[in-house]
Regions:
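C-terminal helix-rich "cap/oligomerization" subdomain common to oxidoreductases
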Residues: 26, 46, 73-75, 282-327
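NAD(P)-dinucleotide binding in Rossmann-like oxidoreductases
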Residues: 203, 214-281, 290-296
Length: 327
């Protein structure tokens, strides 16, 4: 029987828990969550799902050190400000085979190399939860996008949390590259000169337009301030054009080999986290692979992103945080 742990079962962690009710192999679930209200919410969400007889047990712990000594998969769903401490404690006290981390990976640039070395030394497989890689809608276009000489990727919307969520879009563009280690450039000059505190204590949000390149792809991410406006994603390449409103579940596409005639896509576009983690867990536990980006691949984008956003926030506020205050 496999042992899966989730560290932090708050808003996102509880969705991972829900998704694990779909696993297709025998597991024991171990959950680290010191706050009883969060434990209650997590169990309420867990019990909303169909019962799975393959889940032999579910146990809550207040501390990482109380987990089983050997774990097949650990999902770290904490906020970024405590993630280094959490992961170091996990690696110091337990033998772990596989890990899934949330974004933003770490707030300190130095932490990325620290864990690159630690994961390699301990021979641990690590992935980062950028779930658009699991949306089957985009799979049908990947071959065309990866074979294109250039890809143009645009996101527009209001109050979608650029500092918090831009990495999901950048990873999406990275997925469309044929290179394993594409060169990345990020330009923050079109961001607004205003930085505001986010809902998470000690974290900030930015607005305006973030431009740059990833490999042969260019991107432009725009987030306006004030009104929540659903995001639209526009992707253009040599052979395909795609326009998506994920919030409304609407998409159109046109392909060169169909004379650029626009077609409506009428199937499901977005999958929720509560629908995805079970699939990922089964892939990892059975094959030691999954469709999420590896830690090393994700770090290629995360490192320059937190550098640029940290510079923007510190310059705007006239403060030296010594880290990138986003999560």
């Amino acid at each position: 029987m496999k042992k899966i742990a989730i560290i932090g079962v708050g808003q996102l962690g509880s969705r991972h828990l829900q998704a694990l009710t779909t696993v297709k192999q025998a597991i024991a679930l171990e959950l680290v969550e010191p706050y009883e209200p969060m434990q209650k919410i997590a169990m309420e969400r867990y019990e909303q799902m169909p019962k799975n007889e393959l889940i032999h047990s579910i146990t809550f712990f207040d501390d990482i050190t109380a987990l089983s000594n050997e774990l097949d998969l650990v999902i770290v769903a904490t906020t970024a400000n405590v993630r280094r401490t959490v992961v170091d404690t996990l690696l110091d006290t337990k033998k772990v085979k596989n890990i899934i981390l949330e974004k933003v990976l770490f707030q300190n640039y130095e932490d990325y190399d620290h864990f690159t070395n630690r994961f390699a030394e301990l021979n641990i497989n690590v992935w980062v939860n950028h779930p658009r890689r699991l949306f089957s809608f985009y799979d049908q276009f990947l071959s065309d996008l990866k074979n294109s000489s250039q890809v143009s990727y645009h996101v527009q919307g209001g109050e979608w949390g650029m500092a918090c969520n831009a990495l999901h879009f950048l990873d999406h563009l990275q997925m469309m590259q044929s290179e394993d280690k594409p060169t990345i450039q990020i330009d923050t000059t079109m961001l607004m000169t205003e930085v505001v505190e986010s809902k998470r204590k000690g974290c900030y949000e930015v607005y305006g337009t973030l431009n740059g390149t990833i490999g042969n792809g260019s991107f432009s991410l725009t987030c306006t301030k004030g009104e929540i406006i659903p995001t639209t994603i526009s992707i253009m390449s040599d052979d395909v054009r795609i326009i998506v409103d994920e919030y409304k579940g609407i998409a159109m596409f046109a392909k060169r080999d169909n004379e650029w005639k626009w077609e409506n896509y009428e199937d499901k576009i977005v999958s929720f986290q509560s629908e995805l983690t079970g699939i990922v867990a089964d892939d990892i536990l059975t094959h030691q692979i999954c469709k999420l980006p590896t830690y090393l691949d994700a770090a290629i984008v995360h490192k320059p992103f937190i550098q640029k956003i940290q510079e923007k926030i510190e310059t705007t506020l006239g403060k030296d945080f010594g880290l990138c205050p986003i999560s």
